[in-house]
From Swiss-Prot:
This is Transmembrane protein 185-like. Residues 47-59, 109-125 have a biased composition (Polar residues). Residues 133-145 have a biased composition (Gly residues). Residues 1-31, 66-80, 89-108 have a biased composition (Low complexity). It comes from Dictyostelium discoideum (Social amoeba). Residues 463-472 have a biased composition (Acidic residues). Belongs to the TMEM185 family. Residues 1-151, 455-490 are annotated as: Disordered. InterPro entries: TM_Fragile-X-F-assoc.
Length: 490
């Protein structure tokens, strides 16, 4: 009879374990009692011992789960309760499995929490931080929201860059108009002062006035003063490259010294024409050298892929400087040598380079005029500005021809008649200045994208440096708070 009881107990325990195969690998499977018999009495397991087959798992990853498992793992001490059928054992095992699954879910919740330092938010892998859903159920939504936020961030950055580019273009357009208005004002001052000075020279040569040279050159002083004031203009400094500014300052300084040397030469006759022309040679030579430097620097040293506007700016500024210096420097040298008698050549030979310059300038202006007639609305320069340049070059050619006839051919030409082409050219200069002031050209160096990107980079760097400390503090505080909430919930 005792043997039958023992065999029935063993069969009951084995059937209970085999009926739940999913519980074989779970910790709850260790709670199933194993019975042995000594002298016909079943032996009870000591659940407090570690060596017992039914030892309970009390901690998992530092989380106490002993309350849930120990509550349902207690067995009845009576023999009849211990002998319960397989259904009661299965119920106990299912309860243990449910408790362990709950503990595993809590562990997954704890492991699924991720702190996103860049956004200063506590996000879970399974979805929002309010639900704290673990596992892969909410993974798709989380990744979708992250990618959408990333796309929104990129779109916002593109919009900010476009807005910054529009601001820079508007600022460049405004500065461009101010620049050309200042240039127009300077041309008006130079033209009016030149007209007055030309009239004074004609009257002085014909003997109508007998003034001192220091008084006679007062209009020239006005021109130099306006040129000096233009060097301090912020608008001119921002839109014109440093090479043009340097050449302008050197030219103003050289012309000032040349005027002083001219007055000293004609009034006191202390030195010859060669010494008087030294400031002009210095000015024209510096223009020529800086033109070569700007052209070579833009071609060789400036990267056209990263900064194409900068490369174009150096090349465009270098070409007219090179052209002007190459025309004026040999003419100044030959004129100085002829006036001192060191070079026996006609004045027509000395003016060859000047004629070449006038012809090139006239052709360039004429072709611009032809192109502008077909597209008046989109043309860079207006028709009046181009016509003014053409008439100025024509008057310059006529004046040089009359001067050659008066000196080389020994023709008796009245001084006022000789100076008429100069007066007409100076009048067109005034007209061109007025036109530039009223209708500024559409010549804009479009570097708005580079300026916008540089401004955005500077703004981002400053904002990141300011908010770095606040980000660290807020992240640590949020991490501590969420950890405390999680531990209290568990």
């Amino acid at each position: 009879m005792i043997e039958n009881e023992n065999t029935s107990l063993l069969s009951t325990s084995s059937s209970s374990t085999s009926s739940s195969p999913n519980n074989a690998n779970s910790p709850s499977s260790l709670n199933i009692g194993i019975s042995n018999s000594e002298n016909g009495t079943p032996r009870k397991d000591n659940t407090s011992g570690n060596n017992s087959p039914s030892a309970q798992i009390t901690k998992y990853n530092g989380i106490d789960i002993s309350n849930n498992s120990s509550r349902n793992s207690s067995r009845p001490n009576s023999r009849s309760g211990y002998r319960g059928d397989s259904s009661s054992n299965n119920n106990n095992n299912n309860n243990n499995n449910n408790n362990n699954n709950n503990n595993n879910n809590n562990i997954n919740k704890h492991n699924s929490i991720v702190y996103n330092k860049s956004n200063n938010k506590l996000n879970s892998i399974g979805g929002s931080n309010n639900d704290l859903q673990g596992g892969g159920g909410g993974n798709g939504n989380g990744n979708g929201n992250g990618s959408s936020k990333y796309k929104i961030g990129i779109n916002n950055k593109d919009v900010e860059e476009k807005i910054e580019i529009k601001k820079q273009k508007k600022m460049n357009r405004t500065n461009n108009q101010k620049f050309w208005r200042i240039v127009g004002s300077i041309l008006q001052i130079i033209g009016l002062s030149s007209i007055v000075f030309t009239i004074f020279i004609g009257l002085y040569i014909d003997g109508y006035i007998d003034w001192s040279y220091w008084i006679l050159f007062i209009p020239v002083y006005v021109i130099l003063a306006a040129s000096y004031l233009a060097t301090g203009s912020r608008v001119l400094s921002n839109l014109v490259s440093w090479i043009i500014r340097l050449v302008w300052r050197l030219s103003v300084f050289g012309l000032t010294v040349f005027v002083v040397f001219t007055i000293i030469h004609f009034k006191y006759n202390t030195f010859g024409f060669s010494v008087m022309m030294i400031p002009l040679l210095f000015t024209f030579g510096s223009v020529f050298v800086m033109g070569i430097f700007s052209l070579l620097f833009g071609i060789i040293f400036v990267d056209g892929k990263s900064t194409p506007q900068r490369k174009t700016k150096y090349i465009v500024n270098g070409l007219p400087l090179l052209f002007t210096g190459a025309i004026l420097t040999p003419a100044a040298i030959m004129i100085a040598l002829k006036l001192d008698g060191l070079y026996d050549a006609k004045l027509a030979v000395c003016f060859v380079s000047l004629f070449i310059g006038d012809i090139i300038a006239s052709c360039f202006s004429f072709f611009l005029l032809i192109f502008s007639l077909g597209s008046k609305d989109t043309a860079t320069f207006s028709i009046g500005q181009l016509l003014s340049i053409i008439f100025i070059t024509i008057c310059s050619i006529v004046f040089k021809v009359l001067l050659i006839l008066a000196t080389d051919q020994q023709h008796n030409i009245n001084s006022l008649f000789l100076l008429i082409p100069l007066l007409v050219a100076e009048a067109f200069m005034v007209f061109c200045g007025i036109n530039l002031f009223l209708r500024p050209p559409r010549v804009i160096v479009d570097n708005s994208e580079e300026l916008a990107k540089s401004n955005m980079i500077n703004n981002q760097d400053s904002s990141e440096s300011e908010s770095d400390d606040e980000t660290e503090v807020s992240f640590k505080d949020r991490e501590d708070e969420e950890s405390e909430k999680l531990i209290s919930n568990l």
